[in-house]
Every structure is written in structure tokens, then in C-alpha cells.
Amino acid sequence: MSLLDYFRSNKKQSTAQLAKERLQIIVAHERSSRGGPDYLPQLKQDILDVIRKYVQIDPDKITVQLDKKSDELSVLELNITFADDKKG
């Protein structure tokens, strides 16, 4: 095999390798579109249960967001709009 034959050859990936790469792309896409770790809904519920012990809150006025700043830093942001208790 000459050097020119090496560069001319059309190297084909095996079917298994191609399927593996496609699956990795699909899994990465699913993870990124999922929006957060699996424990996030339960964490949100636990935090809200504690807050409800002290004040009334409207579940529609709550937002929870997990932002990944880097590989080592994630920020959990919890925004709650409290009802106005002022009368008269």
C-alpha cells in the first residue's frame, strides 16, 4: 500500500460506531432540553412546603430556575411573589 493509496482510501465508519455517535448526540440533546436535574421538582416542593408553614403563597406566583454558570457552579433561583396582606 503506497502513501497515495492511504490518502485516497475512503474510510467508512462501522455501523455500530455510527449508531453510537448518533445515540450520544440524542442523549446530549435530551439532557440539555430537560432543563435541570431530576431532583429539581422534589427540591422545589420541599422548599415550598417549608415556606407554606409561615406564609400563604400562590403556586402560580412561583418560579424556580437552575442556571449552570460553569462545570463547578450552579445557581438555584427561587422567585416568590407574596400576597398583599394589607387591609383597608
UniProtKB/Swiss-Prot annotation:
Keywords of the record: Cell cycle, Cell division
InterPro entries documented for this protein: MinE, MinE_sf
Entry keyword Signal: no
Function comment: Prevents the cell division inhibition by proteins MinC and MinD at internal division sites while permitting inhibition at polar sites. This ensures cell division at the proper site by restricting the formation of a division septum at the midpoint of the long axis of the cell.
Organism per entry: Aeromonas hydrophila subsp. hydrophila (strain ATCC 7966 / DSM 30187 / BCRC 13018 / CCUG 14551 / JCM 1027 / KCTC 2358 / NCIMB 9240 / NCTC 8049)
The family this protein is said to belong to: Belongs to the MinE family.
Highest taxon listed in the record's lineage: Bacteria
Name assigned to this protein: Cell division topological specificity factor
GO biological process, one term: cell division
Residues spanning the signal sequence: none
HAMAP family linked to this entry: MinE
